[in-house]
Design a protein with these regions (language model features):
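Short acidic/His/Gly/Ser-rich catalytic and metal-binding motifs that mark active-site loops
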Residues: 110-112, 166-171, 322
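Loop/turn elements at helix/coil->beta-strand transitions in domains of secreted/extracellular proteins
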Residues: 1-3, 30-34, 95-100, 153-158, ...
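Active-site neighborhoods of enzymes that stabilize oxyanions during catalysis
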Residues: 237-342
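Acidic, His- and aromatic-enriched active-site or binding-groove loops in soluble protein domains
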Residues: 118-149, 180-188, 226-241
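A long, amphipathic alpha-helix that forms part
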Residues: 138-153, 157-160, 165-206, 216, ...
Length: 353
């Protein structure tokens, strides 16, 4: 059996249908699609969800609260911290199973532990000279397809990732004509990847997901939580993460004091809600159309809030286990933490550390 995990970054479940996304729709109808999609971790951002796809571990164990991680009492970028747990790639290596990773965001290789794969692209986590890049400097879908076509896919586990949907939504907004055109293009790119799997389709389980969706961030002014906290002298550290923010209390702050700060955060104009995610971690999110930051927003679309937790979740393929997993996601909504245990079970690997 070969297991393929394909991620379309930020791709909205809501647009999957026969007209706009015929290739995704073919897999959804020949296999199974969760009626309400999957559900991301909070915050609804890229790197923490991708790391958890491969570890199956929650943020309370990894410190991956978003694109920022809280590890050893300091913030670090999640792609710099690495997965902070044993991954499917680690398990494949121990079990002498072969693995491949071909991704459209080169930072994901370190984030997901995919540099441990037998074959990974971009090589050593950096796009080779001459690679077609999108406006944010990530490999375009066409580069991913070419790399996949030049890779031996007769292997046990494959990770594919397409990044252009996320970039287009950030630049133009998720409801824009440019984003809709990108949905169609990336569906075609996805179809090209599926075609590469056809020779071994009878023995393949294909899991297709997105990590989150996006929302418009067209309000002319960001919510400046960090500067407010500094001016108020709050004993916290804060990192903005699109329409979400991570607030970590200093060690000396009591639970009672931190609870008072939660209330003050929720009274700030532009903040819609928040949740205590760990004793020292509060996750906040903006009102619709707003994002955290300073001055004018840098994007027309973003993510981070609970409004962006919906994921694509489709299981297909010619192997009989595809039907079993498909029935499971039809009966119970999957989430980010569902997939590592599922992949491990399919490949006969041990459970997560």
């Amino acid at each position: 059996m070969g297991v393929v995990f394909a991620v379309l970054d930020a791709f909205p479940h809501s647009v999957v249908g026969s007209e706009m996304t015929p290739n995704l729709w073919e897999q959804a109808t020949s296999g199974a699609m969760s009626a309400t999609g999957g559900e991301s971790l909070m915050l609804s951002v890229t790197y923490s969800n991708h790391a958890a796809f491969m570890t199956g571990l929650p943020p309370t164990e990894t410190g991956h609260w978003g694109n920022w991680a809280w590890i050893n009492n300091e913030f670090t970028k999640t792609y710099d911290s690495g997965p902070q747990g044993r991954t499917v790639f680690d398990d494949c290596k121990v079990a002498d199973l072969e693995s491949v990773a071909v991704v459209g965001d080169h930072k994901l290789l370190a984030t997901m532990g995919a540099l441990e794969a037998d074959t990974s692209w971009p090589p050593e986590g950096a796009p080779p000279e001459g690679t077609p890049l999108d406006a944010y400097g990530y490999p375009k879908d066409e580069a991913v397809i070419e790399a996949a076509a030049n890779t031996d896919l007769d292997t046990d586990f494959i990770l594919f990732h397409l990044n252009e949907p996320d970039t287009s939504m950030h630049m133009y907004g998720p409801d824009s004509g440019d984003a809709v055109a990108q949905y169609r293009r990336s569906d075609n790119s996805y179809g090209s990847l599926v075609d590469l799997l056809r020779p071994l389709w009878h023995d393949t389980v294909l899991i297709t997901v997105s990590d989150h969706c996006q929302e418009p961030t067209d309000h002319p002014e960001c919510v400046n939580l960090r500067d407010h906290a500094k001016a108020a002298g709050w004993p916290v550290q804060i990192r903005n993460d699109g329409t979400g923010a991570i607030v970590v209390a200093s060690d000396e702050v009591s639970q009672v004091e931190f609870a008072k700060l939660h209330s003050e955060i929720l009274q700030l104009q532009g903040v819609e809600g928040g949740v205590l995610a760990a004793p020292n971690v509060f996750l906040a999110w903006t009102e619709p159309h707003r994002m955290f930051g300073r001055g004018e927003p840098l994007t027309q679309g973003n993510h981070g809030s609970p409004r962006c937790t919906q994921q694509v979740a489709i299981v297909s393929g010619g192997h009989p286990e595809a039907r079993t997993i498909g029935a499971s996601i039809s009966a119970q909504r999957p989430g980010t933490l569902s997939w590592a245990p599922t992949i491990r079970a399919l490949l006969g690997l041990g459970s997560e550390a």
